[in-house]
Amino acid sequence: MSILAEKLSSILKRYDELTALLSSAEVISDIKKLTELSKEQSSIEEISIASKEYLSVLEGIKENKELLEDKELSELAKEELKILEIQKSELETAIKQLLIPKDPNDDKNIYLELRAGTGGDEAGIFVGDLFKAYCRYADLKKWKVEIVSSSENSVGGYKEIIALIKGKGVYSRLKFEAGTHRVQRVPETESQGRIHTSAITVAIMPEVDDVEVSINPSDLKIEVFRAGGHGGQCVNTTDSAVRITHLPTNISVSMQDEKSQHKNKDKALKILKARLYEKQIEEQQLANAKDRKEQVGSGDRSERIRTYNYPQNRLSEHRINLTLYSLEEIMLSGSLDEVINPLIAHAQSQFE
């Protein structure tokens, strides 16, 4: 038996063990254990199905090779072997992809955070434009988008947008969006036709629960204040806005979108946990990078990952030297898979 076949046999054995355990009274009565084992089985279900098919093909190849000695059946066996060898090759390719270590956060929902950087009003306008592109992409994927917080500027753009995106595989597809996105275009207010360069930062933070990120209440500084509108005018006569600071890391989150102080506090705490978890991920990625051939970006917000050049209708993905001359179509239709699929393929190739 080949090394691959042995590995697949052990995966199938574990899958069967989990099936038996999940039907046992002891596990059924233990919610934590039941959830843990269910997640493990779900994580190897796809590779288990492919493994069964692959081992069946190997058995078919073995049987047909034996039939080559039979004069009456040799021609039929030859034809069958051709088909089986093709199936074997296709399955091996698929299985290699399935065996790539899976990011434990890939199935999580995310908090998407876009912030205007250098470039003034134009950066704020691009925050809105890129957010719309992400919303269109989410529609294509049947994901749900909920704006958690937004801060508009005076020209119809945004200083910041934070949104919760829910759906299947959200983090797995959007995690490579983290970093600095640079835009080059002629602003509508530019009379001389000069191209302006501005930048925004994107953060992708997995939604986490209390088990994954535990915060000591004594590490939090919670402040309340009155919510302000455009130009600093007061829009609320009560102290409904909330700012929570995690003292050990100095990470701070402010929330004032809700009229209720309790709701603002709840939202701020969830985003704070997501930011702390994101920080853990960044630290882990830096540690793992030493053992990797290369990284598709560190996820660091300061890393310039992509340029959107409107005069040339060009999108340049700097991490994999990808250039596409269909920028406007991608932004208007939300067809970000043209960029995301090559990024995922490149990341997977680093494990081969």
Swiss-Prot record:
One annotated GO molecular function: translation release factor activity, codon specific
SMART domains: PCRF (SM00937)
Pfam family, one: PCRF
UniProt PTM comment: Methylated by PrmC. Methylation increases the termination efficiency of RF1.
Disordered: region residues: 288-309
GO cellular component: cytoplasm
Composition bias, Basic and acidic residues: 289-306
Segments traversing the membrane: none
N5-methylglutamine: residues carrying this PTM: Q233
Keyword Cytoplasm: yes
Compartments in which it is found: Cytoplasm
Keyword annotations of the record: Cytoplasm, Methylation, Protein biosynthesis
The family this protein is said to belong to: Belongs to the prokaryotic/mitochondrial release factor family.
HAMAP family from the UniProt entry: Rel_fac_1
Summary of the function given for this chain in its UniProt record: Peptide chain release factor 1 directs the termination of translation in response to the peptide chain termination codons UAG and UAA.
Protein name listed in UniProt: Peptide chain release factor 1
Gene name for this UniProt entry: prfA
